[in-house]
Amino acid sequence: MSPFISLDELPQGSSVTFYDSSFFKRGSETITLPTPSEVLARPNFIQHPRAENMKLRIPAVFQELGLAVKHSDSTNTIISEGQCLWAVRRFLPKVPVPEVYGWTQENGIAFLYMEYIDGATLKDRWDSLTVTEKEGVCQELKTNITEISRLRQAPDDEFIGNISRRPLSDMVFTGTNFPPVGPFSSATELHDCMSNMFKWPAKVRQPDIDLADVLDPYRDMLPDDCAIHFTHADLNPVNIMVSKDSPCRVIAIIDWEQSGWYPAYWDFFKVEMTTKPGSEWQTEYLPKLLKEPDPDCCEAFYSYVNSYAP
């Protein structure tokens, strides 16, 4: 039987601490989470690999505490990721994710405290794995993906959005110049929105034009009757943590900040578009993990997404 989750079951608030988590059950001494200032005192940025004047924010690691702290000025995204980790561990205990210990905010920055995963990314280990290990890892991932898709919304309250019914956090939308997208009450509403975003350049050129009069050859290619699934939305090998030693095993799926409720086809496209074109992972193993949507859906999705780039 599939587990159901409703919004009122999610932990709420700008500052939440899970005192029943394993972090607070270590020995007899009183233990506390690091303060925001202590978090920010740790190394928090790395150089962007493709932009000389840009740095990337990385989690602060307290390895001695078995703790990683993710932080961002996108406060809703950080809190929603915390809610997601909490929900997956509670309702889908077979899916390996970091345990969440709490979150807080200070000076416009949100801090998410979670378990530090001592492993390697699948991306880093992939080329050194045997065929047997690759097959084993993919079977584990397929099982996890199937398990994730079992989570259900309340039957009378379905929506597309992040886990807390806020706008979608997917980079397909957040990496554009458009305002926040969603939430939606159906796949039809999402697809209509994607179509209007595709048509928007025509509105810029002709402000008086009605978007309904702008031709869109792709709208009818998207399946409005598609099921809504709980989705990670960024199952790139960099977000799959595996054991450092052989035999290689999946130990955690991390970085759930883009996750939420999406059409069932969404995860396939997101994995495909964020991995190296023509790579072994993309061509041979992705089809073993997720069912490829039909060609019309593929054409429409990529035509829309490619048109959204700033």
Predicted regions and their residues:
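An alpha-helical support segment within catalytic cores of ATP-dependent transferases
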Residues: 134, 147-233, 243-246
